[in-house]
Design a protein with these regions (language model features):
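Conserved PDZ fold ligand-binding element
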Residues: 20-40
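PDZ-domain C-terminal substructure recognizer with occasional recognition of PDZ-binding tails
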Residues: 46-82
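Conserved Radical SAM active-site core
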Residues: 64, 72-218, 228-258
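Structural preference for beta-strand elements that scaffold enzyme active sites
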Residues: 150-152, 188-190, 221-223, 271-273, ...
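Hydrophobic anchor at the start of a short beta-strand
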Residues: 189, 219-220, 371, 444
């Protein structure tokens, strides 16, 4: 095994009292092989570690090596956690999609922002959506043999010529063959269609949904997502696309509702779902949480607002059953200003602001807090980008500065953590939360973007203000 391969097999943690712990494997060791064969990736490892008898080759940090014969119960795990979850390089995207958001990014951002992953294995590990265009048949068959489900697929169109055109990839036209093969292995499918007006909507959308319906019970969900366009697009001479307007958004909703009725009658499930942005663009009411049947594609903005609203009501209902919990929090918050009146601003994308404002009435009623939801225009990517998750630090800070200059400024600003890079305290434009706090004249609280996370942040406000007071002294 070469050094490039070995770097993916570094052991990060050994579970206490596990087999690996008992035989002396330690963090920093490298799993070189199992039964003399190198490890292809984490799926290869997971399958082979389940054998009742196996020999593992270990390379130690001091340059020595050892080989250990292990006899154990079949299906018992070794207890090794690797530094690299995938245990291999992540496959990059081989497409040049006409709607690709990464191609519309400005220059000068962090290099990781420009990496386009399209790795089926990441679909299983992290729920990523993949196009299945960069896999040889042998590798596709290997991954299907693990029978991992569901498979999240970026379909966009099922007509071969149209899919090839949209993805600029000659291998993109065989999507239905691959989906049928996956379904034959008992694997469920979540499909995503990024819709571009005049390109893959209208009769092409009907054709795509009709084709996908052939997958039967294994078709779990089909998400219809509007194309996202930034202000940098025109300067790049990219394929000419336009955003959805009210009329075209309503046309897509009508198609979706027609198929929902069809699937409800045939399978007892709606299957086809729309991103919240379609309802907002159309000026129509977003359905209730029960409409989404389990929220299969929240990461695509499908049912996100209904989900957060339901979570918020659930979090408050749970506290109401404790009787004193809300009253105590309300009393502590009232004491923060001395006047009994406390005001918070909640940062949001422009699209969601009105819907979030309606949900926040339960905060006013139960906690006595005045809530102002601030829809922040996206100057960084362009005003056609209206979702909260694509707000940058500089645009949020600009909005906070405006709030601070008001005659009666709010007491604290709440920022959802969906605006941060996953697992980091960094916004998309590389501004850190610490940078923002140091430049803001208003207190800032970053909260977990769930109903429970929001209520927990409210409950913790007295502690935050108390800590800030001590630091100022």
């Amino acid at each position: 095994m070469d050094n490039k391969s070995l770097k993916h097999s570094v052991i990060f943690r050994v579970e206490p009292d596990s087999i690996a712990d008992e035989i002396g494997i330690r963090p920093g060791d490298i799993l070189a092989d199992i039964d003399g064969l190198p490890i292809r990736d984490v799926f290869d490892y997971r399958l082979r570690e389940l054998a009742a008898t196996l020999s593992v080759g270990i390379l130690h940090p001091d340059g020595t090596s050892s080989e250990v014969l292990i006899e154990k119960d079949e299906d018992e795990e070794l207890g090794i956690v690797f530094q690299d979850d995938l245990m291999d390089d992540c496959r990059s995207c081989s497409n040049k999609c006409v709607f690709c958001f990464v191609d519309q990014l400005p220059e000068g951002m962090r290099s990781t922002m420009y990496f386009k992953d399209d790795d089926l294995r990441m679909s299983y590990l992290n729920g990523n959506f993949v196009t299945l265009t960069n896999l040889k048949e042998e590798e596709f068959d290997r991954l299907l043999s693990y029978h991992l489900s569901p498979l999240n697929v970026s379909v966009h169109a099922t007509e071969p010529e149209l899919r090839v055109k949209m993805m600029n990839n000659q291998f993109a036209g065989h999507i239905m063959e691959r989906l049928r093969k996956a379904v034959a292995c008992g694997i469920d499918i979540n499909a995503q269609l990024v819709l571009c007006p005049g390109l893959n909507d209208g009769p092409h959308l009907d054709k795509s949904i009709d084709d996908l319906s052939e997958l039967g019970e294994h078709l779990v969900s089909v998400a219809l997502v509007p194309v996202g366009l930034t202000r940098f697009r025109d300067a790049r001479s990219l394929y000419p696309l336009r955003p959805f307007d009210q009329e075209s958004a309503r046309e897509v909703i009508a198609v979706a509702e027609r198929y929902q009725k069809f699937f409800l009658k045939k399978f007892g499930r709606r299957i086809v779902f729309l991103a919240d942005e379609f309802y907002i663009r159309a000026g129509m009411t977003i359905p209730r949480a029960s409409h989404y049947e389990g929220f299969y594609q929240l990461e695509n903005g499908v049912g996100l607002l209904a989900c957060r609203r339901a979570e918020l009501f659930h979090a408050i209902s749970k506290r109401k059953r404790r009787k004193t919990h809300i009253a105590e929090t309300r009393e502590h918050i009232s004491a923060l200003t001395g006047t009994g009146e406390f005001r918070i601003a909640v940062i949001s994308g422009v699209d969601a602001a009105n819907y979030i404002s309606e949900s926040m009435m339960c905060i006013v009623d139960n906690y006595g807090i005045n809530v102002e939801v601030v829809g922040v225009p996206n100057d960084f990517f362009g005003h056609s980008v209206t979702v909260t998750g694509l707000l940058t630090g500089q645009d949020i800070l600009k909005a906070i500065s405006g709030l601070a200059e008001m005659p009666n400024p709010v007491d604290v600003v709440f920022i959802p953590d969906v605006t941060l890079r996953s697992g980091e305290d960094v916004f998309l434009d590389d501004m850190t939360v610490r940078d923002m706090v140091s430049q803001s004249t208003l207190p800032i609280i970053v909260y977990e973007t769930t109903g429970e996370g929001f209520i927990s942040a409210i409950e913790n406000m007295p502690n935050v203000f108390s800590q800030n007071s001590r630091e100022e002294r």
